[in-house]
Amino acid sequence: MGNVWSLTSQMFPPKPKWTVDDMPDLTGKVVIVTGGNTGCGKESVRVLLLHGAKVYLAARSEGKAKEAIEDLKKETGHEAIFLPLDLADLVSVRRGAEEFLSKEKQLHILFNNAGVMLSPMEMLTKQGYDLQFGTNVIGHFHFTKLVLPALLAAATPTEKARVITTSSSANYMGTLNFDLWADGPARNKKAPGDMYVQSKHGNVVFAVELARRYGAQNIISHSLNPGSIRTDLQRHLSPFANKMQDIFLFPVSMGALTQLWAGTSPEAGQMNGEFMIPWARLGKARKETGDPEVGKKLWEWLEAQCKDY
């Protein structure tokens, strides 16, 4: 009952008590936003630029990224920096991390914002994983680990570095099944919705485990449900489903709010390994996401998948 209540109650959150006007000045801070060319990512980049941050907009499509950068420059007067990153290809992930590290010694905030939702089951990553789990979890894990030296270099006891990972209310709808993530008979019995739940639950487990492993080194790691937001994530839904969903969806300005709060507010900087809910509030993920044994198992599994890339 608790998981169902958490899921449904977050669809209609109370009015926010925190807005982007409450964000601190971010001059001198280096930030990466994955999936920054569209949706909540693009809105987050916009607000971060307005608050003085140096922002790397990480995206797969150079054309779409540069179009977004131009739009944002016209709107804010500041220019984000394109970082090529295809989270569905672990080789591309390494190249993207290496390009960033060749330009910057420090990374103050990483927003693991990009995501794939309800993609057809025949769609796989370059290395043969389910596209949703591979992009949302494996790709972000690999990228985070590779840029960790820059996060650690930026982190101090008074100014901790932050990693903010976007999950969703789908984390409440199931637990991890390690047999489903690579292409094979077990996965092929499942539907896109099942795999989305796997990835969003996995996002929270990863974020909690990151906090557990690196909190003592001044790394803050939170995950969040951005809310029910009108974005390109719905592109794999049917026109009818999109129309029905649209009734319940909020604009991206609201969708970016919770991750910006988690990534920049002093209040969120006093916590670690937490799950944030709309709008800009502390919440609770499904209890299994905090199990240290599950976190350790997932982390070690992810390391094994990424070690050759």
Swiss-Prot record:
The protein's Enzyme Commission number: 1.1.1.-
Record has Zinc as a keyword: no
Organism, as annotated: Armillaria gallica (Bulbous honey fungus)
Annotated transmembrane regions: none
Protein name: Short-chain dehydrogenase/reductase ARMGADRAFT_1048226
Binding sites annotated in the UniProt record for NADP(+): K64, D86, N113, K145, Y196, K200
GO MF term set: oxidoreductase activity
Top-rank taxon: Eukaryota
Catalytic residues, chain numbering: S167 (proton donor), Y196 (proton acceptor), K200 (lowers pka of active site tyr)
